[in-house]
Amino acid sequence: MKRRTVLRLGGAAAVGASLATVGLADPADAQAELALSVDGTERELGVEEAISAVVLDCSVEWAYDVPDGVTPSTVVVELAAGAGDGLTTVATSESPSLFGEADGSESFEADLIETGVLTADQVRSGVDVTVEARLRVETDSGDVIAQATAEDTAPVVAETESVNATKYGSVGGSGELRIEIA
């Protein structure tokens, strides 16, 4: 599920636990910024409960500024996630852009189990999930004129509540000790 909301960020792109700025373009002074902060989660499961989803709900703030004379046509924002080596793109937003300077926010929601990023066993064992936001600004011909990435890592843990066996079982009986002589 994807929701798109364009907002004026002002100085908000500089806020967040992780901020990356990379200006990569043919013109030397093109700039792009992303802000991303991801919180971890911990949950206790009942004895009979199973993990059905791990949902990444994320808002990515972005901004870019290209030099005069450079005309962008498309802004692409991607969200990728992974545990361990490698990241998998779990959501993408693409929108037209005709302005040399723009900023906004993209909201994404993705199930990391459904997309194959995580397994329920990984979550039960506890896993650090890396989330990466990517921004690309392209021209009509597909040339990338500005891009940036921002990354954050958050723990995900689901523990099964322990069962107190003394609550569910009992033992008893009667007996005697006797001495026998041969």
Report residues per predicted region:
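Terminal disorder- and signal-encoded targeting elements
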Residues: 1-182
